[in-house]
Amino acid sequence: MVAINDSTDSSFFKENPKIFKDEHELLRYIVPFKNWVIGRPDRKEYAIRNGAPKLLLNLFSLENLSMNEKYQVFVVLNSLMSEDQDPFVQFLRHEDLLSVMQMISKRDSTPYGMLNITLKVFNTMLSFDKAAEYVTQLHSDSIINQMFDLYTLPLKEQPSLDVLRISNLSSKILHRLILYNSKVGDSPRFCSALFQITNRATQLRLYSRRRFWNDCSILITNSLGTLNAYLKQHVKSYKQREKTRLESNGHVSPRDMDLDEIENVFEGNKDKVALFKSEIFGPNGDEYITQLFCLVRQFDPCIRLLSISCLVTLYKAGILSKNQTKEIQMIVTPILIRLFFESREAKQIAPRILAIIINENEIMQKTAVNAGFIDAAKYLLEYATKEEENEINFLSDELQSSVCFNLPATKKEQKNLILESVLLAVAALTTSKDEYRKLIVDAKYLPVIINALKINSNSVKKAACECLLSLSRSVYILRTGLADADVSEPLIKLLSDPDTRVKSTATSAICNLVLKFSPLREKFLTTNFIDTLISNISTKDSSLRKKTVWVLRHVVFGDDETIQLEPLKKIGASKLVELCNDEDLGVQEQMLQVLRNFTCQKEESVDFLLKMVPMELLAKILLEKLESKNPILIEPSIYILVHIAASDGELRDSILRQTKLLLLVKEIMLQEAQRLKPEQMSTNVSSPESDSEMDLQEDDFDREMRPPFDIYEEDTYEPNSEILLAGIWLCINILWPKQCTSPSQEDKERASILQNLGFGECLQMLQNHSSPDVRERVKDALMYINVTD
């Protein structure tokens, strides 16, 4: 319990000993109690701990309260809720919410002062999840209509501070309700009102100058924030409908696609865009978008940021026209970079919005670099990491009174958010081009990024890992800028982080750093590192499992036999089989790739694997993968057989005994040959020595590890020549002659078996294939299979 030290405090409670025991007694002294707690956090805490929340909420049920008594109760309630909301959550009842809504519904007979404080309390109550769900589920239409009516007061009445503040509070409540239910009746009418209020508030700011300036600014930011939430909810709803359509048409299974994977929901379809615009904006969609671009040029940083947020939501959904997209590039992007030097709110938000725009978009990335991103971001990093004495915690009135951005209040949290936002922007800039990665390294960003891995903030650590992931996708940077970087120790430590998302992002960053040609590989390959990976394999999080197995895929590809064998020894046979049959398709694929890399070029590794998993069991596993008809499982499965066949004659014969497996390989080869288009052909030379996964991590691996704002492309499993090449290499390795001079009897017998299975005819069909790789390998295979002629 908080101690009350001054004499005034103690005398107040000595005179009123029952004030925290009976709601009637509290009501009797409500005015002196109000004066006692307001402006005093210590007294608020004392009152909360002594049961004031329950008593105040109980007062709602008293029907004979006067308007003044209700007002005083609401003022005290609002003051205590602003101090600590948690104690109110357990005592808040449905009837309390109904009492507040009833008060709001009688607005014609309720003074504006009373209405104002009622809306404040209601807005705070709606920040409780259960309260918001109850209101939106059972009273959605009525309360939304009431809030809409109050929100549009500035269009109906003469401007006053009360009118503006009621409109502001109503917009906050609408914002919260939209997050739970995006259906707001007549959508075009709602959006029209948002823009009308924004225009009205803009005019009032201009003509009334200081009188309404602050309240009008808050109203504009709240209106834009509500609009952005509304647009996001409708885009999400459209994605859900699109996903349902794809599932019903059999194009995708429910488990194969997240909503975030549908990047451009309109697929460049002008009719779909026009229909969506009409649903949301009515006939004035382009006019409203033009208004948003006008607001981008406003002097106020908060208004700029929120109008840009609305435009970026439309841009990422693919709703903007080519000319409007050009304005995002030429106007919005440079303005965002200039906002790096503006208010502290702008410093926290602008880099994150910029990251959304430039992520995986080389045109936008080039514009950002030309607009001075490198220097501006470096300035922000220095600002965020600089220790300053006596720095005051500060948020502008617009954002303190807004629900649009959930910004932290403390100096440390604000600087961490700035650091996180800048790191996400750096990660987004460096997703594609080595040129920009080199600029980042040359500008000395790496020490800041590495230090961010050690900061006590999950979001900052995750963002730093994102940067390392983007930078490490370049072979040049991997061998130069990152070569001497001290990243192994902090990254290995993050593999044991309590936060799963941090572990997952750190794992994805490590993936490229342990490639065979990486200078950092040896620093990672320690017993502790391997043990941590093996531990993470058993996690319930499928994304982390997949990424952990992907790292092992690179770890086992190397010349050091001890390092290569250790992971599989620690995994064990039963876990290995379990991972091959994991419920997550990505984990299955990566475990097969582990076995593919493990068996590459080494007879000892093949022998070790077959001691763990006998040939009959392995063949059964591979048969199931081939029967799945899924290319991401088929290719590594066949290459495992390719590597086993490259070992010795006995193993080739054991493969030849798997008739069902070989027939399925032949069938797949024929299907791939018929489906493959010329533009899908590989131009890379493949061989048993080079077929293992030695590429840098591709985009489909780190989809979930990109910045959370990103929307990713749907995975498409198109046929590719690698599957054909794998099948041809299997024939070559099975038929590889025992001696160079003339084919032995064993060679002829193996060739005869493959001929009888139909591989000869299959290879004949591939002689004129469009892919030069396929044609070259087919020549070799035919030379060996025709020894029986």
From Swiss-Prot:
Q: Which UniProt keywords apply?
A: Cytoplasm, Nucleus, Repeat
Q: What biological processes does GO assign it?
A: negative regulation of gluconeogenesis; proteasome-mediated ubiquitin-dependent protein catabolic process
* One cellular component term from this protein's GO annotations in UniProt: cytosol
The organism named in the record is Schizosaccharomyces pombe (strain 972 / ATCC 24843)
- Keyword Repeat found: yes
- PANTHER family from the UniProt entry: ARMADILLO REPEAT-CONTAINING PROTEIN 8
Its family?
A: Belongs to the VID28/GID5 family.
Q: What does this protein do?
A: Component of the GID E3 ligase complex recruiting N termini and catalyzing ubiquitination of proteins targeted for degradation. GID E3 is regulated through assembly with interchangeable N-degron-binding substrate receptors induced by distinct environmental perturbations. Required for the adaptation to the presence of glucose in the growth medium; mediates in association with the substrate receptor VID24/GID4 the degradation of enzymes involved in gluconeogenesis when cells are shifted to glucose-containing medium.
Provide the residue intervals of the ARM repeats: 434-473, 476-515, 518-557, 562-600, 603-646
How this chain assembles, per its entry, is: Identified in the GID/CTLH complex. In the absence of stress, the complex exists as an inactive anticipatory complex (GID(Ant)), composed of Gid1, the E3 ubiquitin-ligase Gid2, Gid5, Gid8, and the RING-like subunit Gid9, awaiting a substrate receptor to form the active E3 ligase complex. When cells are shifted to glucose-containing medium, the substrate receptor Gid4 is induced and becomes part of the complex, named GID(SR4). Additionally, Gid7 transforms the GID(SR4) E3 ligase core into a higher-order supramolecular assembly (Chelator-GID(SR4)).
Give the main location: cytoplasm
- Listed name of the protein: GID complex subunit 5
Q: Where in the cell is it found?
A: Cytoplasm; Nucleus
